[in-house]
């Protein structure tokens, strides 16, 4: 794990389902391709994931890793806590409003150079 850099965003105001839709598009890609893909997606989740990815890139640069040789080795979104509220409905009923949060994890690694 010495050749990895990570960034974690906790309590993002975003449901994990919506975050995973964007995350699945960039999993395993190199960082230049991933940033290009994220910049073209018109979703709030793309902006949030892009911010976390840029943070991971900055962490990798701080650790002295080669920025041009990085790829997304692992990325996932987990479910955070849920705020539960109730809204009144017809005939005296109430339904629950679930405000979902996410924890987004991004791990970057350097590509291994093959000797020939």
Curated annotation (Swiss-Prot):
Q: Does the keyword Signal apply?
A: no
A biological process (GO) of this protein is: translation
What keywords are assigned to this protein?
Answer: Ribonucleoprotein, Ribosomal protein, RNA-binding, rRNA-binding
Q: Give GO MF terms, alphabetically.
A: rRNA binding; structural constituent of ribosome
Pfam assignment, any one: Ribosomal_L22
Q: Where is the signal peptide?
A: none
Which GO CC terms are listed, alphabetically? cytosolic large ribosomal subunit
Entries under Gene3D superfamilies matching the protein? Ribosomal protein L22/L17
Look up keyword rRNA-binding and say if it applies: yes
InterPro entries (alphabetical)? Ribosomal_uL22, Ribosomal_uL22_bac/chlpt-type, Ribosomal_uL22_bac/org-type, Ribosomal_uL22_sf
As for family, the record states:
Belongs to the universal ribosomal protein uL22 family.
Q: Sorted alphabetically, which HAMAP family does this protein's record hold? A: Ribosomal_uL22_B
What role does it play? This protein binds specifically to 23S rRNA; its binding is stimulated by other ribosomal proteins, e.g. L4, L17, and L20. It is important during the early stages of 50S assembly. It makes multiple contacts with different domains of the 23S rRNA in the assembled 50S subunit and ribosome. The globular domain of the protein is located near the polypeptide exit tunnel on the outside of the subunit, while an extended beta-hairpin is found that lines the wall of the exit tunnel in the center of the 70S ribosome.
How is the subunit organization of this protein annotated in UniProt?
Part of the 50S ribosomal subunit.
Tell me the protein's name.
Large ribosomal subunit protein uL22
Q: Tell me what gene encodes this.
A: rplV
């Amino acid at each position: 794990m010495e050749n990895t850099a990570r960034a974690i965003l906790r309590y993002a105001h975003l449901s994990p389902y919506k975050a995973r839709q964007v995350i699945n598009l960039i999993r395993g890609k190199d960082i230049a391709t991933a940033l290009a893909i994220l910049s073209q997606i018109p979703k709030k989740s793309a902006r949030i994931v892009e911010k976390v990815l840029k943070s991971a890139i900055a962490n990798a640069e701080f650790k002295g890793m080669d920025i041009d040789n990085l790829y997304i080795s692992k990325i996932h979104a987990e479910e955070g806590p849920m705020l539960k509220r109730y809204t009144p409905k017809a005939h005296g009923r109430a339904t629950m409003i679930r405000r979902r949060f996410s924890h987004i994890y991004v791990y970057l690694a350097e590509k291994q150079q093959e000797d020939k």
